[in-house]
Amino acid sequence: MSWKTMYRSFYYQGAPEPEDIVLNAEETALLVIDIQNKYMDVPDDPDENRRWTPFFERMNSIVIPNTARLIKTCRQKNVEVMFARIACLKEDGRDRSLSQKKPGWNYLLMPQNTEESQLVPEIVPQNDEIVVCKTTDSALTGTSLRLILSNMAVKNVIVAGIFTDQCVSSTVRSLADESFNVIAVEDCCAAGLHELHEKELEIINMIYCHVASLAETISFIR
């Protein structure tokens, strides 16, 4: 099955196949979301370790290598490469959004200069590639990314990163609402559970973005 027929939600099961996608390099940007050291730290607790093992396996064997390949290809094809990472400006995190202050897994206190807030070594930015710091789920909310994309005449955004059902989904929806054409690269994304990853891609596909594989996405770029 191709991207034209995969990840069909209830609402789009009978919809016609979309037209072929052509991404002109000068009008396209790649946005890599939140692939940070924090999320590659293996939990000390044995139960949590076991619970998160499938996620770490997918990240190490699929998502990070594929994202590195996608970045390399975009650089070669003169597609603008951008990054978003969760990082607060204040050491005590007072500038964070409420969603990152609430107790639980989503409580995040990562000042911008800490090691855990940095992008993983396999996908570090080069030269003047843009990195936006956010304390929100969406990479557009609370950053200048929307204005940056507009100023650079970007119309198409390729999205990779984590977590599919959280920051990736929020960013994809924001981009769609701002009238960008969005491609979510399935095998460059992950969620805590693969079931959550698959379901969220089904939910956002064809309304907020088109979901495609790495190989398909590369073939779209002209």
Model regions: which residues?
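Active-site-adjacent betaalpha module
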Residues: 1-29, 38, 43, 72-77, ...
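Intrinsic disorder/low-structure terminal segments
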Residues: 54-55, 82, 162, 219
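A short alpha/beta connector and helix-capping loop motif
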Residues: 26, 42-74, 79-81
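Short hydrophobic beta-strand that contains or immediately precedes a catalytic carboxylate
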Residues: 31-33
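A basic- and aromatic-enriched beta-loop-alpha substructure that forms the phosphate/nucleotide-
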Residues: 82, 86-88
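A substrate-binding/cap region within the structured catalytic cores of diverse enzymes
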Residues: 96
